């Protein structure tokens, strides 16, 4: 990166400024000093884009699943399909699990397409296990599905659903790791912990760039599962607006 190149240039300049008499040893010319670079993660050709691409994959998975699932359920509600289902003896929990199962299959398929396209066509390097990459992206997709279904209950039109994007999706761009937040206050950075994409971004970065395994990503996986569980419960409660039992 540009920062690494500047640091290397500064070190080279320091070596060149060493007085000649300090480079002498017992009257003989000392061997020329050399600087060897070793990269903990990545290599000399790695760029900032390589660093954020794992997070971008998670972001695209979240964004498309959130938008499609929210609008799909909204259409069923505005066209009366949901009301006809609620008129039956089916429980609210069964309705929610049915929607999650149906749209979940579509979300998983969409996630597989995004991940495999990124890895095999865009040639994104994966240092760790691809199975962890798939699992993390499937979890963020299911979290986006549950959040999208919940948010759609507050929208009365597709336009209103789109208006939720700045509230739900855009903040995650800032707090997921796509934009460095090292210089901001700690309390502002802490806001990012309420967004699922932050945990997905951390886990994907650990697997795809650092090659780490379960012992480094288990906490992020647990948090993503909690997001899915919490918003599934909120969806069941949210259907009380349309039916009390």
Model-derived features: where do they sit?
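Short, solvent-exposed coil/turn segments
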Residues: 28-30, 66, 168, 216
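Sterically constrained small-residue positions within well-ordered secondary structures
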Residues: 26-28, 75, 230
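Membrane-spanning alpha-helical segments of multipass transporters and channels
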Residues: 105, 109, 115-119, 125-245
């Amino acid at each position: 990166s540009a920062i690494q190149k500047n640091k290397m240039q500064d070190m080279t300049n320091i070596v060149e400024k060493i007085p000649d008499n300090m480079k002498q040893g017992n009257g003989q010319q000392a061997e020329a000093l050399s600087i060897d670079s070793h990269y903990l993660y990545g290599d000399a050709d790695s760029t900032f884009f390589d660093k954020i691409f794992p997070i971008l994959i998670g972001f695209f998975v979240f964004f498309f699943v959130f938008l499609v699932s929210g609008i799909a359920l909204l259409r069923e509600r505005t066209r009366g399909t949901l009301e006809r289902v609620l008129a039956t003896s089916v429980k609210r929990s069964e309705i929610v699990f049915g929607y999650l199962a149906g749209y979940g299959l579509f979300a998983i398929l969409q996630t597989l397409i995004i991940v495999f396209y990124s890895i095999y066509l865009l040639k994104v390097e994966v240092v760790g296990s691809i199975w962890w990459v798939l699992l993390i992206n499937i979890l963020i997709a299911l979290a986006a599905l549950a959040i999208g279904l919940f948010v759609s209950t507050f929208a009365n039109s597709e336009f209103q659903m789109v208006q939720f994007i700045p509230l739900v999706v855009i903040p995650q761009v800032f707090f997921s790791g796509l934009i460095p937040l090292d210089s901001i206050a700690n309390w502002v950075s802490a806001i990012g912990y309420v967004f699922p994409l932050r945990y997905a971004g951390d886990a994907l970065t650990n697997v795809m760039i650092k090659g780490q395994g379960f012992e480094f990503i288990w906490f992020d996986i647990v948090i993503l599962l909690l997001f899915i569980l919490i918003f599934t419960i909120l969806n069941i409660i949210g259907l009380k607006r349309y039916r009390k039992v």
